[in-house]
């Protein structure tokens, strides 16, 4: 995927347009799916980020399991609570104590996301994308990618929605691909990649 990400803009555009024609969708959809997948690959190829984060949510059901047909614009991630607290949020305590701990963990998570996490993600993604914390939501990092196909309904950004209080278990390793690689596998030196993901049954249960 890295090779495709670094193709000349014209070559990338042709790949996405041809893939879209085969699929009966718009090039902007194929383009955004590529960048969602590329961001996922970069995050979980980095040892530090892979230790901090876990893939979850509806996007995981479509991208990692193929259980729902859904075009995914956002990436839901669980932040390992141990990065922001020494106290186990699952330990027995009073409701008042639990509420205080949850608030403390959330506050530390906001600090961590804007500091260490963003500071790690930026060099991992490199100069191809611009990464910023969402102005109106401190749990979101927006990754702006080099869009070639303007679309009134698709922002040229991948939203990383990050929370520390979601369940971490059960999880497993799954392989993920993108639309363009499925249509033109010969263009990709690596058609798919591995991510650590909350298992589908847990995600369905939470929904």
Describe each region flagged by the PLM.
Residues 11, 17-18, 32, 37-41, ...:
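Catalytic cores of NTP-dependent nucleotidyl/adenyl transfer enzymes across multiple folds
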Residues 44-75, 79-87:
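Active-site nucleotide-donor binding segment shared across nucleotidyl transfer reactions
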Residues 2, 20, 39-41, 45, ...:
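Residue-level detector of functional hotspots within protein domains
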Residues 1-38, 66, 85-97:
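N-terminal regions immediately upstream of nucleotidyltransferase
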Residues 66-68, 72-73, 83-99, 161-180:
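Hydrophobic transmembrane alpha-helix bundles
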